[in-house]
């Protein structure tokens, strides 16, 4: 069975594992998911990720990050642009999540970028998700 929205599946797995205080979460690998994981790592929301060989295909394993008293580093995740309703933002009208405390992940002509990176480069694109 094919998955219609792999990014939403990734974000849901992250949200569920985070709320259950799991240390790692695994999912099927794709280049897009790996780029999203790169952004989450660079912004400090996850501890790291690795690509592993599975019986069929590859899998992406993400190490979740918690504070010293097991506080969650990811407070919330929301998928914005969906297969049935794409959401785009111009470079002059980029979204700001929680007044700049969170990030918006955009798919641009320059690759996947956060809202701040897209603003510096002056590019817009499809708004994939909000993370805070």
Swiss-Prot record:
Annotated SUPFAM superfamilies: Ribosomal protein S8
Family annotation (Gene3D superfamilies): 3.30.1370.30, 3.30.1490.10
Organism: Paenarthrobacter aurescens (strain TC1)
Any single GO CC term annotated in Swiss-Prot or TrEMBL for this entry: ribonucleoprotein complex
GO biological process, one term: translation
PANTHER family assigned to the protein according to its UniProt record, in alphabetical order: 40S RIBOSOMAL PROTEIN S15A (PTHR11758)
One GO MF term: rRNA binding
Protein name listed in UniProt: Small ribosomal subunit protein uS8
Known partners and oligomeric status: Part of the 30S ribosomal subunit. Contacts proteins S5 and S12.
UniProt xrefs under InterPro entries: Ribosomal_uS8 (IPR000630), Ribosomal_uS8_sf (IPR035987)
Function: One of the primary rRNA binding proteins, it binds directly to 16S rRNA central domain where it helps coordinate assembly of the platform of the 30S subunit.
Swiss-Prot/TrEMBL keywords: Ribonucleoprotein, Ribosomal protein, RNA-binding, rRNA-binding
Stated family: Belongs to the universal ribosomal protein uS8 family.
